[in-house]
Curated annotation (Swiss-Prot):
Keywords: Membrane, Mitochondrion, Mitochondrion inner membrane, Translocase, Transmembrane, Transmembrane helix. Its EC number is 7.1.1.9. Gene3D superfamilies: 1.10.287.70. The chain crosses the membrane at residues 16-34, 41-66. Its main location: mitochondrion. Component of the cytochrome c oxidase (complex IV, CIV), a multisubunit enzyme composed of 14 subunits. The complex is composed of a catalytic core of 3 subunits MT-CO1, MT-CO2 and MT-CO3, encoded in the mitochondrial DNA, and 11 supernumerary subunits COX4I, COX5A, COX5B, COX6A, COX6B, COX6C, COX7A, COX7B, COX7C, COX8 and NDUFA4, which are encoded in the nuclear genome. GO terms for molecular function: cytochrome-c oxidase activity. This is Cytochrome c oxidase subunit 3. It comes from Anas platyrhynchos. InterPro entries: Cyt_c/ubiquinol_Oxase_su3, Cyt_c_oxidase-like_su3, Cyt_c_oxidase_su3-like_sf. It is found in: Mitochondrion inner membrane. PANTHER family: CYTOCHROME C OXIDASE SUBUNIT 3, CYTOCHROME C OXIDASE SUBUNIT III. Component of the cytochrome c oxidase, the last enzyme in the mitochondrial electron transport chain which drives oxidative phosphorylation. The respiratory chain contains 3 multisubunit complexes succinate dehydrogenase (complex II, CII), ubiquinol-cytochrome c oxidoreductase (cytochrome b-c1 complex, complex III, CIII) and cytochrome c oxidase (complex IV, CIV), that cooperate to transfer electrons derived from NADH and succinate to molecular oxygen, creating an electrochemical gradient over the inner membrane that drives transmembrane transport and the ATP synthase. One of its GO terms (biological process) is mitochondrial electron transport, cytochrome c to oxygen.
Length: 86
């Protein structure tokens, strides 16, 4: 993505929301299997995939902010206000 002259952060297209949704579906399906059939293998696979998606997504956020310089002071202030208002 080319560097723009605006004060907000435009993210690149990312596969992590789709993978996170698939991991959430796998986790809930694993919970159903665990409740009904006492089999926790699918639940463990779902939780492991959720953990891997979280780690990879956070790695990408750190790379965008630290190495690519996308988190300018104005963007950091906006992120801070967003967390406070949340």
């Amino acid at each position: 993505m080319a560097h723009q002259a605006h004060s907000y952060h435009m993210v690149d297209p990312s596969p992590w929301p789709i993978f996170g949704a698939a991991a959430a579906l796998l986790t809930t399906s694993g919970l159903v299997m665990w409740f009904h059939y006492n089999s926790s293998i699918l639940l463990a696979a779902g939780l492991l995939s959720m953990l891997l998606v979280m780690l990879q997504w956070w790695r990408e956020i750190v790379r965008e902010s630290t190495f690519q310089g996308h988190h300018t002071p104005t963007v950091q202030k906006g992120l801070r206000y967003g967390m406070i208002l949340f």
